[in-house]
Curated annotation (Swiss-Prot):
Residues 228-239 have a biased composition (Basic and acidic residues). GO terms for cellular component: cytosolic small ribosomal subunit. NCBIfam families: rpsC_bact. This is Small ribosomal subunit protein uS3. GO terms for biological process: translation. One of its GO terms (molecular function) is rRNA binding. It comes from Paenarthrobacter aurescens (strain TC1).
Length: 273
């Protein structure tokens, strides 16, 4: 299962978190779940259009009642900000026009782009578009990630590799990439290279090490507590007693008294006769 599923979704709530934070209201038009999801997709498409050189790793979205906060994680913040903030103002204006709310735009710099799977995949795709040999591009990216401190990396390319008539898939791996281990901190990225032979998909998995018990405890403490049966005061599993744990004395008197009452009735009838 871990070999096929998206590593971010597989570890959601364990080592990864949601990239969109908001609450939907099904009773209000424009605030339903489908409306917010559609709006998130349009925001991310707006960020990716014309911003290929900015090296955007991810976009986080958080909504409040009258404001939308957009955090852009980029390897080149200067391109996103623009000269004297002109590009940032343009992006903020388009986002406010799209959402109809006040937008707070935060531009965050990615300190180590060689360790970001999305940026690594985008870099390989750009080299494939420039007619660089796919094996050379893959191995160069893997060496850069390992020099940056990655404990393992896996790169896969699918499509008409090298202009071949028949499409195929090839992947290379260095180090450990434990996709089944939930505590493993694995970053995943995907990007498509638009070549003259067609599109080539690039997938990258980067293993950054296991999440320690201390980090998991900090994440659990930061997460809001949810009302579950196991969290109720008293015995584990709530105050409701199991069927096997109920005392037998509650059901025994009814079983004993019923035959006695049935036996007393014929005796009374015989005395009257």
């Amino acid at each position: 299962m871990g070999q096929k599923v998206n590593p971010h979704g597989f570890r959601l709530g364990i080592t990864t978190d949601h990239v969109s934070h908001w609450f939907a209201d099904s009773t209000k038009p424009g605030q339903r779940y489908k409306d917010f999801v559609r709006e998130d997709i349009k925001i991310r498409q707006l960020m990716s259009t014309g911003m290929e050189r900015a090296g955007i790793a991810k976009v986080e979205i958080e909504r409040t009642r009258d404001r939308v906060r957009v955090d852009i994680h980029t390897a080149r913040p200067g391109i996103v900000i623009g000269r004297r903030g002109a590009e940032a103002d343009r992006i903020r204006g388009e986002l406010e026009k799209l959402t109809g709310k006040q937008v707070q735009l935060n531009i965050l710099e990615v300190k180590n782009p060689e360790m970001e799977a999305q940026l690594v995949a985008q870099g390989i795709a750009e080299q494939l578009t420039s007619r660089v040999a796919f094996r050379r591009a893959m191995k160069k990216a893997m060496q850069s990630a390992q020099r940056a401190g990655a404990k393992g990396i896996r790169v896969a390319c699918s499509g008409r590799l090298g202009g071949a008539e028949m499409s195929r898939s090839e992947f290379y791996r260095e180090g450990r990439v434990p996709l089944h281990t939930l505590r493993a901190n694995i970053d995943y990225g995907f990007y498509e290279a638009k070549t003259t032979f067609g599109r080539i998909g690039v997938k990258v998995w980067i293993y950054k090490g296991d999440v320690t018990a201390k980090e998991l405890a900090q994440q659990a403490a930061a997460a809001p507590s949810r009302g579950r049966a196991g969290d109720r005061p008293g015995r584990p599993g709530g105050d409701r007693r199991r069927r096997n744990d109920r005392p037998a004395a509650e059901a025994a008197p009814a079983a004993v008294e019923a035959p006695a009452a049935e036996a007393a009735a014929p005796a009374a009838e015989g005395g009257q006769a």
